[in-house]
Amino acid sequence: MLANINDNSTLVQLIDMRGINTSRMKNAHHMFWTKEGLTKHIDLSEFDTSNLEDAGYMFSTPYETVSTAQIDPIDFSHFNTSKVKIMTGMFAGSYLPSIDIRNFDTRNVVDMQYTFAGLKNVRHLDLHGFDVSKVNNIGAIFSGNSTLVSLNLANWQLDSIHAMDSLFAGMHALTDLNLTGFTTKNVTDMHHMFTECHALTTLDLSSFDTSKVTDMNNMFRDNFALKNLNLSSFNTSNVTNMKEMFRHDGVIYPLDVSTFDTRKVTNMDGMFYWTLMSPENATLDISNFDTRSLTSALGMFNYTKAKTIYASDQFTVNNVAPHPHEMFITNTNLVGGNGTQYVWPNNSSQYAHIDAPGNPGYFTRKP
């Protein structure tokens, strides 16, 4: 019913839904979507959505649309979503200046894929308290949001979600991300979850349950401004892939991975690549790392400016292939516990052990 009513328009000044009986409407898929232009004002003050089930792409705009037109925010205060199941792409690519949907009832929603992807002008999005307990698809829900500054997802209970890969990736302007009470207890995949959040300085993940996660590769990569990262609740007992997990996170300090269980991890390639750049001469404590399953650690510590790496005898490279292979490149500040200083070309896995007389290495036994 009423799908694509705005299709092929240019710049419509007003869509006034007053006087139209929509009380029996179940499907509004692509209803206000347009591929040619924008709508200046949409009046939904008497819009009856009490039976609406499908709001997919309802207010969306194609990502490739380019416009300098100024449009008005939509008043959603009377928008009834109690029966809505589909919100796929609902606001994808939207030019709305703001989206206030704090009154939305999402208890029956199952699909939120692309719901807020590619927003062009929205800087603040408050979704705290949404009932997302039935949602089973949040793929790329926030993808391409390069202008969003703050995002509040407090108390999201995502118990039906198994994959959160790339969930917040590419949110370059984001400085405030509230994940208090955000649950992840059934998630198995978190790869690239926070990649390229360039402006984020603080990230508190203390509510995360990661006990079922197997993939954390590139999880925090390229977070250039991130200084404070709370991983205190992290259970990594089932993780097998930590490749480039903290790559280019140069200002996180301290980088506390003391809760990590690494007994099943097979890949640590570039895990600490270009980390601990500031302050220089810092300490990296991986004394809890048990690397019995490790098969690849190529470039694991490349370019870090750490002076001390605490480790234990449980850190072993016996299974890496090929062995030896390069693990330390330009670690010019690094000094082992017996005084062995990093020098080129001594950059291989042969030095990935505790420094001792007659057996030079780059690690230090923790006091």
Which residues make up each language-model segment?
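Negatively charged
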Residues: M1-P367
